[in-house]
Amino acid sequence: MSKKLTFQEIILTLQQYWNDQGCMLMQAYDNEKGAGTMSPYTFLRAIGPEPWNAAYVEPSRRPADGRYGENPNRLYQHHQFQVVMKPSPSNIQELYLASLEKLGINPLEHDIRFVEDNWENPSTGSAGLGWEVWLDGMEITQFTYFQQVGGLATSPVTAEVTYGLERLASYIQEVDSVYDIEWAPGVKYGEIFLQPEYEHSKYSFEISDQDMLLENFEKFEKEASRALEEGLVHPAYDYVLKCSHTFNLLDARGAVSVTERAGYIARIRNLARVVAKTFVAERKKLGLPLLDEATRAILLAEDDE
């Protein structure tokens, strides 16, 4: 690699590349979440028959992974670059490898391996066939073909490509610590994110009010159910995300036992499944507007029979 791209140049390069492949460029969704997969731009759009091609950066919060800014690679919040394509292109792996070339990584000059790692997200009732992508011994991407989302079988299959931007940038810039990554010319990653990383870690592990979080979970769960009773999918899903993040804070604090943990995950999963079913039903009421006319007519006619 000749030119070492800054963090923001990596994002811009990936945005331009996937835009050229027909992906819409979405913006990060304004709710805490543990992964880009949980954005409605993936979770909701991966279900149902309508096509969907999108790419976006998603800041992802994982309270239990916080290390007070003392670990060079483990973070409370990291950034993912998420690509979802439905139906999955037959050449999605080739498209991915070409994206690495755009970043200055020639696949012929590096050890790039697709290591089987089937994916599952119990809290959203989602699963799929997957691979980790290893670049010279370091995982940089997760590849997934969704088989189930929100408890529903996916048809057509959605392909998801999730780049770990911090790992990718560490490799490209040849630094050992994420805090040494150059975010923009003359500005280091640590100068932006080290203090928030420390503060969020301290809050997650030491300061958070467990009683308040437990109460909030109950309130968010009830409000999600109330919104669903009114057929309001998107507000309901916002509260599912709030439930998920609140649970993650409780888990990081050690406030839930092993048995309770399974119970909380099941409660979130049950809500996510109702959201998924309601979303599909609402899209059908709208006439599946993203489908071509011929396919739409066939599917809607089948529902009428």
Swiss-Prot record:
In terms of CDD domains, this protein maps to: GlyRS_alpha_core
InterPro entries of this UniProt entry? aa-tRNA-synth_II/BPL/LPL (IPR045864), Gly-tRNA-synth_heterodimer (IPR006194), Gly-tRNA_ligase_asu (IPR002310)
Instruction: Decide whether keyword ATP-binding is in the record.
Output: yes
| Keyword Aminoacyl-tRNA synthetase assigned | yes
Alphabetically, the GO molecular function entries are:
ATP binding; catalytic activity, acting on a protein; glycine-tRNA ligase activity; transferase activity
Q: Where in the cell is it found?
A: Cytoplasm
What EC identifiers does the entry list? 6.1.1.14
Name of the top EC class for this enzyme? ligase
* Main localisation: cytoplasm
| Assigned keywords, A-Z | Aminoacyl-tRNA synthetase, ATP-binding, Cytoplasm, Ligase, Nucleotide-binding, Protein biosynthesis
Q: Which domain of life is it from?
A: Bacteria
Q: Catalysed reaction(s)?
A: tRNA(Gly) + glycine + ATP = glycyl-tRNA(Gly) + AMP + diphosphate
Q: Which GO biological process entries does UniProt record here? A: glycyl-tRNA aminoacylation
Q: Name one GO cellular component term.
A: cytosol
Stated family: Belongs to the class-II aminoacyl-tRNA synthetase family.
* Protein name stated in the entry: Glycine--tRNA ligase alpha subunit
What organism does the UniProt record list as the source?
A: Streptococcus pyogenes serotype M12 (strain MGAS2096)
* Organism ancestry: Bacteria, Bacillati, Bacillota, Bacilli, Lactobacillales
The gene designation is glyQ
